[in-house]
Design a protein with these regions (language model features):
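Short, small-residue-biased leader/transition segments that mark boundaries at the very start
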Residues: 1-7
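Alpha-helix C-terminal capping segments
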Residues: 3, 32, 166-170
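Acidic-residue sensor for enzyme active/binding pockets
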Residues: 4, 46, 151-152
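Active-site nucleophile and cofactor-binding loops and adjacent substrate-binding regions
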Residues: 8-9, 40-42, 152-157
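Conserved thiamine diphosphate
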Residues: 10-56, 208
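Thiamine diphosphate
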Residues: 13-23, 56-215
């Protein structure tokens, strides 16, 4: 095996395991390690594919996945894993949802709601937080008025912050909304309730998007 693999269980909010077990900082600290690759699956099928990919990978690699029952949705979307490349689930224009890991499930709910409201909307499964898909990110502002990043990690050092830095470095003007957990410890509680409290559930995300579009 050519890789140094880290399997990150309990990534994101874990609810009943308690405050000390909330996995909401790992994207931030893992992304600071030179040469580290950080990825997360959207469902159980992609987790299997990522594990197989990691076995033959050369270099340090971390796969993060959440606690609880494995998500079985979006099974028909199973493009091969390619280094630093995302996966388009719905390709349209208007609003772009770029979701990482477990937030793809939430993003699919948001996408369906926005479509019902009459908005054109794309959905991208980021797959990699490091390295992120720079080619995909460069393409989005050409056909989208709003780019929304979605992650189950704190804001500081997270996926959304890296995307914002990328657009700034490229001097790309785009409206960007980062959906992430506030920079604070999250208490013990039911995971679904906690997601609503920190603003990363589908209802909260839709509200944030509507507010952003009104600006």
């Amino acid at each position: 095996m050519g890789s140094e693999m880290c399997i990150r269980d309990r990534a994101g909010l874990v609810g009943s395991d308690g405050e000390t077990h909330q996995g909401i900082f790992d994207i931030s600290y893992l992304s600071t390690i030179p040469g580290m690759t950080v990825l997360a699956p959207k469902n159980k099928w992609e987790l299997s594919d990522m594990l197989k990919y990691a076995v033959d990978f050369s270099g340090p690699i971390a796969i993060r996945y959440p606690r609880g029952e494995a998500y079985d949705g979006l099974r028909e979307y199973r493009a091969p894993i390619a280094y630093g490349r995302s996966e388009w689930i719905h390709r349209e224009s208007g609003i772009a949802l770029v979701a990482f890991g477990s937030m793809v499930k939430t993003a699919e709910q948001v996408w369906e709601n926005l479509k019902q409201r009459g908005y054109a909307c794309s959905l991208i499964n980021a797959r990699f937080a490091k390295p992120y898909d720079a080619e995909m990110l460069s393409e989005l502002p050409k056909k989208h008025i709003l780019v929304v990043t979605m992650e189950e990690n704190v804001v500081s050092g997270g996926f959304g912050e890296h995307v914002a830095a990328f657009y700034q470095e490229q001097k790309t003007e785009t409206s960007l909304l980062s959906i992430a957990i506030p920079d604070e410890y999250v208490e013990h509680g039911n995971a679904d309730v906690l997601r609503h409290e920190v603003g990363i559930d589908a209802e909260s995300v839709i509200g944030r998007i509507m507010e952003q579009l009104r600006k």
